């Protein structure tokens, strides 16, 4: 069996209300455990529309047929009206996810705000965003928050140093090839990172691959991954508009000997055996703007 970490990003109110129950049902049907990362504060995702002025983001929205993929409820959230607080209304679904045996972690307090502003927020603002998210998720699930994955992979060393204070068991804040121990600015080692290694649906659809051929494409990518494969899905896509296609992917993956698992299951017992690395800003195929990306560091110890 080839073990693949399955990360579920929950970005929006609709994705929580509609996509989470659909995925919980699917995972129960196929006996799959995954890692869910919840956005818990205001759903302001519609405020991303100003990014249509940027050619790369406009092309992404056009090639993925975003209106059909996400629906206008998601695309306009938090524009003409205040964004709905996700955990306040839908916290029981977060608790249900944990009770079903899935790993539950923090994605963001304000997903859109993090993606748009993290690069210019002060340290105090970063701390506040993480603290608000941790408090809301812990109140919803009734258990401590032990892992996190920042919105849009917008992380760098400064973000990692802020998150260090929350005592997470691991973070999944960047793109890369294998788990590692990040080196912080003062030379200390930060919380273990488990990078996402595989392309997401919205990064490649309409450019690298057609809708009909996506499952073939991602299964090849999984088989060819020579690192520690981690695949990210979104409740707004694989749990809603593309749920039928995703179920076919799960069926085919089982037949090919692919075992999906929570991200923590990818870690060795001895975390000190993991290589060193850094999280640095870099452009990334299929995405607009910078992402946190893994770079290797030689261990001279």
From Swiss-Prot:
Pathway: Glycolipid biosynthesis; 4-amino-4-deoxy-alpha-L-arabinose undecaprenyl phosphate biosynthesis; 4-amino-4-deoxy-alpha-L-arabinose undecaprenyl phosphate from UDP-4-deoxy-4-formamido-beta-L-arabinose and undecaprenyl phosphate: step 2/2; Bacterial outer membrane biogenesis; lipopolysaccharide biosynthesis
Reported function: Catalyzes the deformylation of 4-deoxy-4-formamido-L-arabinose-phosphoundecaprenol to 4-amino-4-deoxy-L-arabinose-phosphoundecaprenol. The modified arabinose is attached to lipid A and is required for resistance to polymyxin and cationic antimicrobial peptides.
Domain of life: Bacteria
Name of this chain's protein: Probable 4-deoxy-4-formamido-L-arabinose-phosphoundecaprenol deformylase ArnD
Protein's GO biological process: 4-amino-4-deoxy-alpha-L-arabinopyranosyl undecaprenyl phosphate biosynthetic process; lipid A biosynthetic process; lipopolysaccharide biosynthetic process; response to antibiotic
Keyword Transferase: no
A GO CC annotation given for this chain: membrane
NCBIfam families, alphabetized: PRK15394.1
A Pfam cross-reference name: Polysacc_deac_1
Catalysis: reaction(s): 4-deoxy-4-formamido-alpha-L-arabinopyranosyl di-trans,octa-cis-undecaprenyl phosphate + H2O = 4-amino-4-deoxy-alpha-L-arabinopyranosyl di-trans,octa-cis-undecaprenyl phosphate + formate
